[in-house]
Amino acid sequence: MFDRDDLPNALRETLAKVRPLIARGARPQTSPLPLTRELTMRNPFAFAAFPSWKRLFEDTSKAAQAAVYRDPAFRKQFREDLKRPASFADWARITLHEVTSPKLKRYEGKTVAEIAAERGVDGVDALLDVTLEDDLQNEFTVQSWNTRIDRMAELLNDRSVLLGLGDGGAHLDMLCDSGYPTYVLGTWVRERKVLTLEEAVRRMTSDPADLFGIQDRGRIKPGLAADIVIFDPATVGSGGRPERLHDLPGGAKRMVMRSRGIEMTLVNGEVTWEKGALTGASAGNVLRS
């Protein structure tokens, strides 16, 4: 389940509809992280649902895409498309993450809304003008869902909701969900006090272990596997946006989420992580369904 800005009542309505399923054992699931995606204007998938952007995917050469971005008719149609409800229509949720042109470096880290205000144009012109000025090499970060603190607090406090979501690396160049446990502990527990520390730990350990029938995990108890994370409650956390690395074959990129405040990790009683580094121990087992 995701919370969308354009559908403020969707979470409550959906949870109400699925209560009979929850009573039979079903569990809704959500990510405690704001869903943040990387967007390049050479592959503008985030806008693919808009009719005006169809041309961008018919001829994907740089010259053809640049011609579309310059076209006043395209910009006019895009503005019309944006009048329909859309989860990313708020330009304050789209940030210029990286540029190649030195002249545009001053805009890195600013939202499209901020760039538009500085230039005295609307969001459409700001987005497309900066893209053309950087020869379509710039990259944006889009905060799509789960960005409203009040509605997320309500969702996270619903004990029927399973915390944690991931795509198994299917979009490793666009997003990274693996930082959600440290984000919960740092943001939702310590900073915003939406969950108690004890409840947050339970929701991320014994709760999923019980759901999936993993009987020897999820608790610190004699006779169970010693899978333990030792952390500092005062410093544990992670950011809401992943970091980009270029360490895949051919220099391809992937997204990673860095953690803070993790002192040690044990898997089956062996220390696998200590003082910010892997120890080299491989004490886990592959789970097969």
Predicted segments with their positions:
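Structural beta-strand/beta-sheet cores of well-ordered domains, especially the beta-sheet scaffolds
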Residues: 24-28, 159, 218, 226-229, ...
